[in-house]
Amino acid sequence: TTMPFTLVTDAMVGFNPDEEYVYVSVGSETWIIGKIRLEEFMKEAKMEDYKVLKTVKGSEFEGKKYTHPLLGNISGLEKMSKQENYHITIAEKFVDVNAGTGIVHLSPANGEDDYNIAMKRKVEIFSPIDDEVKFTEDAGKYAGMFVRDADEEIVRDVKEKNALVRIGKIKHKYPLCWRSQHKLVWLARREYFYMLDRLGDKAINAAQKVEYFFDQPKNRFLKIIKEKHPWCISRERFWGCPLPIWKCTECENIERLFSRKEIVDMADDLPDGPNFELHRPWIDKISIKCKKCNAKMQREEFVLDTWHNSGAAPFASLSDDEYEKTIPAPFFTEGIDQTRGWAYTLLIENVIFNNKAISPYNSFLFQGHVLDEKGNKMSKSTGNVLDAADLLDKYPVDLV
């Protein structure tokens, strides 16, 4: 792994079922390594004295239990490991045998592919990480540490357990915040989603009726629509349109309240009266009595994805009569990046609201981006933007 902190949330180890793996005798130990990587890996580990004992298919490792070396340090993980389907080896075709040992550890709390495998196999997600991205008490020895700050200590602990074969530095891609350039940490969080596969082919059928003027942006947009990737509509922020969902603190019953009147009619307590401010923190003070168990219901403290707001523009800003007369609009235009932004949310929400293959626009022109001298997108945060006013002082307007 290139992220030692993910050993705290380790759940499975993956082998490629179609590839060969070798059992290798190294001193008093037996190692398992992908056959393709054996010679190169042993050179990297500076191991010359070893012997191949046998060769097996990756599929043979499906369902075997293994012992995590740091269980004594991580109380929550030690409890999880007692589950039948936890800390087992699995055989999955996504495993890349051309890097490392040809074997990968899976941390469902810190990676999308790992998470999807866990969901498919009904493996519980262990995520002892709080809102400040620090380990909680369930992380045992590492509690209170920012997860990336725990990397070095975890490596030292693995070494002390005589479980470290090799450590080194490699150059690889890593996700960064597009504004601050800080390293990002992937976390499995409880959120709200639109499960777009439930729309069937309505969205793609609607998108195919639109004129895009050029094939490249058209093909890019249609490919994204065809993915039917779940859309996370909730955000863990303070500013924004509050998610209008109340959840029971006891039985977890859910109420969806889409108007001020519905909230007032069901409210158990209105601290600011019936004309309360609809945003946070005021709306968070309102409690509702659960219809099922009479316990207290509290609003889910999420706001909506701001793209949800912009995607709802035709419905939110027009009366029913105005909508019928003006939608679908004859023409929209935006930057090419809006294939995953406004163009996407406008179309998806229009299909959802109508429950039909109806686009909110008849044509959409995706414009290209002006790039800097290195071919990178211009960005104010990066500081590589050219001021059009300065250019117009030097060059003809039609050229600019």
Question: Which residues does each predicted region cover?
Answer:
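Short amphipathic beta-strand/extended segments with alternating polar/hydrophobic composition
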Residues: 1-2, 30-41, 76-81, 187, ...
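Short acidic-glycine loop/turn motifs at beta-strand connectors
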Residues: 17, 25-29, 130-131, 247-253, ...
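Conserved oxyanion/phosphate-binding beta-strand-loop segments in alpha/beta enzyme cores
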Residues: 48-94, 182-204, 292-320
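Protease-associated
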Residues: 6-15, 19-103, 112
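Short active-site loop/helix that positions an aromatic residue
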Residues: 2-18, 24, 40-45, 114-123, ...
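Residue patterns forming the tRNA-binding/recognition surfaces of aminoacyl-tRNA synthetases
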Residues: 1-8, 21, 63-67, 94-258, ...
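Alpha-helical recognition segments enriched in aromatics with Gly/Pro capping
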Residues: 121-133, 237-239, 263-400
